[in-house]
Amino acid sequence: MKVSARRKARELALQGVYSWQMSHNDIQQVELALATSNDMQKVDMAYFQALLRGVAHNASKLDATIKPYLGRLPEELDAIEKAILRIATLELTERIDVPYRVIINEAIELAKAFGAEESHKFINGALDKAVRTLRKDERD
């Protein structure tokens, strides 16, 4: 199956956000490291950069936005889950051009590929609750 440029952008953004969360390195350093160590030709670079930079610059706001829908303390989140939720929350709040169903599906696929065994179920549940508020108009 051919992977879309946006999916590749999300996968690399996830790697970048995870790296940034763990290392606390400057986001430009993380971005440069990813760009030099990956084939970026089939990646939607603008989308990758928007996700990576958007999460890095708005992490606290994104965390506060998704927190009511988690059903557990944010400190209990696995680092991959946190990164996926931050990316998806950014997309839900800032990328109105992307349908919420696409955002949730992509987050689930990231969780299946990179998360713990049941992460995708948790991600799905949290985001499904979040869209009831964050994308209320789209759901009606």
From Swiss-Prot:
UniProt GO cellular component terms: cytosol
InterPro entries for the chain: NusB-like_sf, NusB_fam, NusB_RsmB_TIM44
Name of this protein: Transcription antitermination protein NusB
Keywords of this entry: RNA-binding, Transcription, Transcription antitermination, Transcription regulation
Keyword rRNA processing assigned: no
GO molecular function, one term: RNA binding
GO biological process: DNA-templated transcription termination; transcription antitermination
